[in-house]
Structures are given as C-alpha cells and as structure tokens.
Amino acid sequence: MVHLSDVVVTKVSNTVLKHKHATRNTLARNRMLARLTETAKQGALLATHDNTELMWLRRHVGTDDIAEPEPYLFCFQHDWDALTSAERALRTIKGLAEFHPDWAFWGYDAALIWGLEVPNDLLGPRFLVKTGCSVTLSSGCRLLRPQMAGALERVDGVRVTSFWRTVEECLLRAPFSYGLAIADSALRAKGVSRGDLCERLRADCEGRRGYRRAQVIASYADGLSENGGESRFRAFFIAYGFSVPELQVEFRDPLDSSQVFRVDYFWRLENGTCVIGELDGKGKYTLQDGGDRGSVDP
C-alpha cells in the first residue's frame, strides 16, 4: 500500500510548460514546412487527410508563406505566385489525384498531364471520368462516362485517358486556334503525320458532335510548330485567309556558313519574294543569361 507521505509532488513552472509547448510547435512547423518543400520539388501541391495537419496548415494560411489554392491542397505562396497558369493547373491536378486516388481525368486536364500544349483560356473546370468518385464534385466539373473514356492509364501518378483518346476529346471541343495548339503538340510528341491523326479521328469519332471541326483542325496540324503560341498565330493566318506558312525553315549565315538559323514562319510569294515571320516570346526580352528563348502565353 502506498501512503500519501510517500508521494512527492513536484511543481512544474509555467516557463517549463511554455518551453515544451513552444518546442512541440516548432517541431510541427518544421515538419510541415519540410513536407511543403518536398512536395514543391515534386511539382505538386501538398494533400493531407490528417486532421491535425489540416488544422495546422489552415491556421497558418496567410502566414509562414502558406497558401491553400484549392480545398485541402497547400503550397508556399511565393511558389504559387511564380507559376504560370498551366503550371498551377498541373499541380492542382496532381494534388487532386493524390487526395482522391479514385479520380481519373480526361480532356484538357489529361492533355496537361500528357505534356500537350493547352492554351490558358481552356484551363479552369476539372475534367473527370465518372468513376464513382468518393466525394461530391463541385459545380462546373466536366464529367465523361466510363464507356466513353476507354482504358485508363497512369501518368506521373495520375489516372488519365489514353494519349490519343485525350487528343480526340480535346479536338472535338476546342475552338480552332486552341485545338491546333493541342494537335500540333500531339504530332510533335508522337512523330506522326496529320494524315495519321485524321484517320484516327475518322475511325474513333465520326458522327460525334464536333467531328467536322476536329477534322479541320487535324488537316492543318503540323508537328514542326514548336509551341502553343506559334500554333495559335498560324491558326489566325489560316482563319483570315493568308497562305499557310512553312515552319522552321533553315537558313545559313552568309557570313559564317557553319551557323544555321531557323525562322518560325516562311512564305515564298508567287513573284519570288520571300517573307519571314518571327513570333517573339516574352522570355526573349527578359532572359539575361543567354538561355533558351521563351514562348508567348498561349
């Protein structure tokens, strides 16, 4: 039996308690900041199902340089501010895929995951395959029936429609100039011809809404286009009745034959006159270290 006289009561000062509390807070802060840093290196947003982590992160949104650009998805504010629209969309999709493993993406979202050129104006609502998602989807989501999605693939940890199914679904919906950017990048990625793309569309999409527009887009697609900006400006030439230019034509420097230059657009007129067109990206005027030329916002 233990007697009260044997019990020693030790009084812990408030200073010690505060120190322990501060230590726990510091450890939690360091742990979460490390996770945010690691997630940023992976090109994604931090997604967490842990209520303790979620409460800590939301308490510090607006402080500690932490932002919550989408519900349950977190990152450093300075990282988010530095991203392009396409980079933000790409990280959001990867974060959602981490938070909702049962989600699958199609359309413009899948095109981003496949590395295709998706103009900024097409970014916004999520494109999800209707696979019995575990949570209620927000308004504005574009749903696709599983039987229309076909076999799904996993790319960078994200479930998406196959490469060519993704391209087809985009071309069935995209306006001409936007669709041309996607089609050009698809040909460039796979090294196939516009004829191959037209045949795929005929075999898979004939009779569907948007098929005729998709075929027009495919008939002008050219894998030599180097970025979405070049594709969209070529689409404007086509739409306004100008001759379709040759792309990436090479010229030798008359002063140094070992140097070769390529031009974005080249026209040879009927009278023999040659016209060169160049699309200069913003990066050309901002890069100071001789890096590669940038492209305009598509």
Q: What are the residue ranges of the model-derived segments?
A:
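Short gly/ser-rich loop at a beta-strand->alpha-helix junction or flexible surface loop bordering the NTP-binding
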Residues: 1-210
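Surface segments flanking catalytic/ligand-binding clefts of nucleic-acid enzymes
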Residues: 7-16, 23-39, 48-52, 187-298
